[in-house]
Amino acid sequence: MPILFIILFLLVIWAAFLGKAGEGYSNLLLNFDLKQLTNPTNIRLAFSQAFFSLSLGIGVMITYASYLNKKSNLPKQAIQISFLDTLVGLMAGLITFPIIYTFNMSSSISESTIGTLFTTIPTGLGQYGLIGRVMAILFFGLAYIAAITSMVSLLEIPVSTLIDKFNLKRKYASIYSFLIIFA
């Protein structure tokens, strides 16, 4: 989704010029404390995020790896995927925290920041009329497409199992898996 990445990049630049961007960066995002790297809660949360965002707990990466050819450089690809996943998360923070401080939204953040991006982006972009609304629609539309296409990968595990165990064609294995999961 290069277009979504480009929109994220543009939003990072836009957020950097908001009135209280520096305050948002220094207070919430770039306030680095080395002691927190040894905090067991933070370590658990970091692993939880990695397992969630890379779908490691349900075997998606293992299933994808089974389709790679023998010459694939797995360590290099793992580093690239991890880097891009971290970069997108950092970009989301670089967008979210300036909006929180500029538009006084600190009270809307709970202990869990899940969904914060989805409340701050509309608020921040809503202040900029039609252009802001168009950017919000593009962002959320592309985020929706990215989420749906990522969900398709979750079907690959039962589909590949049905193909391997019962020698089904991919089309029928996909239909059966879809019906069992979503019916």
Which stretches of residues belong to each language-model region?
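Membrane-embedded translocation segments of transport machinery
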Residues: 2-148, 152, 166, 172-173, ...
